[in-house]
């Protein structure tokens, strides 16, 4: 994940900027840079690779300014090199950016026609030029940013530094986190409190849609409508590094809300958004074209991510996939054909059963690919190819952002397989990449349902049993929803394929039974409506998670209908996961359980 820092100080800030960026290294990065005001003039130092390269550059060409911004970058638009490293500048403004500007292509062409010259391949440079365009109309820095933000589509965090403005930083947040730090006559902006910890423990977290004008005397926060608002200043414990919830009551809530950002970063890691392509390592240790089958092994939530991936691989790549929970797979003595692909999914990369299955697959001459959140883990080290998820540290035991990042990674892998095997055309790939790019925005819109879901959880908390139903890729999501609810609320819940309702679960339906139906409007929607009618006829209380067309065509009375935006079918598991997670979370809060550390469960299961 990218990291952002901004400082208004009294002494030269270059060293402080680099120190803060070091605290953000855990997010991952491939280049870094800072910009300061030197006698009022914007001056940048940038470098590809690790921060030590930037430090060398600063030793050779020091900066002495007392106002500055800094950034660590994961490449999204454009290669990881010095030219594409942040900050980006245009005339009187420098900007650092975390996230994805979805409409950057359209804006870039518009700006080119107006005579703006681009040095980089990034979407960030578009933002710098847009602000410059507004300032050329006679607007000041604050007004120029206010005019620019509505032109941007996507999920992002931004920090601006302006030439000649020694006492102004401007930050903006939409979908990606940004915090304001308060010091003694000094002020700070940062991706999180971890970056700000060396300087201050007084931190205010911007809410989604907020933007802030920072001066040494304080900060003025405005919401998306431009109204001045107050955001509480809290004492941060970020000196303990990751033990920091921000404004959230639990880590799980924080991690649910981080998903637009981290899924965006994960997708960006595997996508060439400029050319509409999925990008994997240039030399794979196997050839998709010669594979006869693939297998997937995982545990818990990671297993459900693998179940979704099975649908994708079989649809996009016409590649048969066998999947099982690792604790079963490892003891089945399953027959393998030499030279096929074995995929292992694990948040920690240390899950014992998954690791044991990996070793068995290696003995059977399989190509081993892992999808992990810890690229230095044992599973990663023992794999032929590692595809990291960029979820960042996940503290809550119940997985949320790691799950959706696993889905994002596996989706990209399935599309790459389909392209390599000649099943997907170039146009198909472009369409899928466009759909993937929209996921962070769609997730942000899904999070807006939280107040409604919180009210609904009050009803769910009264239940002893809950049933989840889904078809297609919504079936694994039903399983995941049931797992989340039972993990953290301790309410018994089961997930079923909707078509299996009549083969047993229907016997449990009565007027006390909530039935959560995950059903975007797709080719099997009418079949799912038939199952809902069977539930309604027996008094079951239906909670429908769907889209506008689904809500319109569902001819069944529901206890509640949660309506998500219309989206491509491929991305529904990533986006529909959010209301499922929120429903479990708020039910658990009402039940008074230990949400982040539910009884009897551990984050990383390293025993068999």
Question: Which residues fall in each region the model found?
Answer:
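Conserved short alpha-helical segments that host acidic/polar catalytic motifs at enzyme active sites
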Residues: 1-245, 249-250, 258-292, 331, ...
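Glycine-rich oxoanion-binding loops at beta->alpha junctions
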Residues: 49, 66-83, 274-286, 309-345, ...
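Acidic/histidine-rich
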Residues: 152-186, 456, 461-487, 522-524, ...
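Extended hydrophobic-aromatic, low-complexity segments
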Residues: 181, 305-306, 322-323, 352-355, ...
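Generic C-terminus detector
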Residues: 226, 252, 541, 554, ...
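Active-site phosphate/pyrophosphate-binding segments
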Residues: 259-263, 267-295, 364, 385-514, ...
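Glycine-rich phosphate-binding loops that contact phosphosugars or nucleotide phosphates
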Residues: 289-438, 518-562, 583, 591
């Amino acid at each position: 994940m990218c990291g952002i820092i901004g400082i208004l100080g009294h002494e030269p800030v270059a060293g402080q900027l680099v120190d803060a960026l070091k605290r953000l290294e855990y997010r991952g990065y491939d280049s870094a840079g800072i910009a300061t005001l030197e006698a009022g003039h914007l001056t940048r130092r940038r470098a590809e690779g690790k921060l030590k390269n930037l430090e060398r550059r600063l030793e050779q060409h020091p900066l002495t300014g007392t106002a500055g911004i800094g950034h660590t970058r994961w490449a999204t638009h454009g290669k990881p090199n010095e030219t594409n490293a942040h900050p980006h500048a245009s005339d009187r403004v420098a900007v650092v950016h975390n996230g994805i500007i979805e409409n950057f292509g359209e804006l870039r062409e518009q700006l080119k026609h107006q005579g703006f010259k681009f040095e980089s391949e990034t979407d960030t440079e578009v933002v710098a030029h847009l602000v410059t365009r507004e300032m050329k109309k006679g607007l000041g820095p604050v007004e120029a940013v206010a005019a620019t933000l509505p032109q941007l589509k996507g999920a992002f965090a931004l920090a601006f530094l302006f030439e000649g403005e020694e006492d102004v930083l401007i930050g903006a947040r939409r979908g990606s986190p940004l915090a304001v730090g308060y010091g003694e006559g000094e002020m700070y902006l940062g991706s999180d409190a971890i970056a700000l910890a060396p300087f201050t423990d007084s931190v205010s977290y911007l809410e989604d849609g907020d933007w802030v004008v920072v001066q040494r005397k304080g900060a003025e926060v405005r919401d998306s409508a431009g109204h001045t608002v107050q955001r509480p200043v809290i004492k941060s414990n970020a000196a303990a590094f990751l033990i920091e919830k921000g404004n959230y009551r639990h880590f799980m809530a924080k991690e649910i809300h981080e998903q637009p950002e981290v899924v965006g970063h994960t997708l960006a890691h595997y996508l060439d958004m400029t050319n509409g392509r999925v990008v994997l390592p240039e030399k794979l240790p196997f050839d998709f074209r010669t594979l006869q089958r693939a297998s997937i092994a995982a545990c818990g939530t990671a297993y459900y991510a693998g179940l979704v991936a099975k649908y994708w691989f079989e649809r996009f790549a016409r590649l048969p996939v066998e999947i099982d929970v690792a604790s079963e797979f490892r003891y089945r003595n399953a027959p393998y054909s030499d030279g096929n692909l074995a995929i292992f999914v694990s948040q920690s990369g240390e899950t014992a059963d998954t690791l044991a299955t990996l070793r068995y697959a290696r003995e059977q001459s399989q190509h081993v690919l892992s999808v992990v959140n810890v690229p230095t883990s044992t599973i990663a080290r023992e794999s032929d190819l590692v595809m990291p998820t960029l979820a960042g540290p996940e503290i809550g035991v119940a997985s949320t952002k790691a799950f959706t990042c696993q889905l994002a990674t596996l989706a990209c892998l399935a599309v790459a397989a389909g392209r390599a095997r000649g099943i997907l055309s170039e146009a198909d790939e472009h369409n899928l990449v466009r759909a993937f790019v929209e996921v962070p925005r769609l997730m942000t819109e899904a999070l807006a349902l939280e107040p409604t879901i919180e009210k609904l959880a009050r009803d769910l908390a009264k239940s002893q049993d809950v049933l989840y139903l889904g078809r297609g890729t919504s079936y694994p999501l039903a399983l995941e929803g049931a797992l989340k609810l039972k993990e953290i609320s301790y309410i018994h819940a089961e997930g079923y394929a909707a078509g299996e309702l009549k083969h047993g679960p229907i016997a449990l339906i009565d007027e006390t039974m909530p039935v959560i139906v995950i059903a975007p409007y797709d080719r099997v929607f009418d079949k799912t409506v038939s199952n809902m009618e069977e539930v309604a006829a027996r008094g079951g209380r239906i909670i429908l998670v769907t889209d506008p067309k689904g809500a319109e065509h569902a001819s069944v009375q529901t206890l509640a209908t949660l309506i998500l935006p219309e989206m491509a079918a491929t991305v529904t598991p990533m986006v529909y996961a959010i209301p499922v997670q929120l429903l479990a979370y708020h039910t658990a809060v009402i039940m008074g359980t230990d949400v982040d550390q539910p009884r009897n469960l551990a984050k990383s299961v390293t025993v068999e």
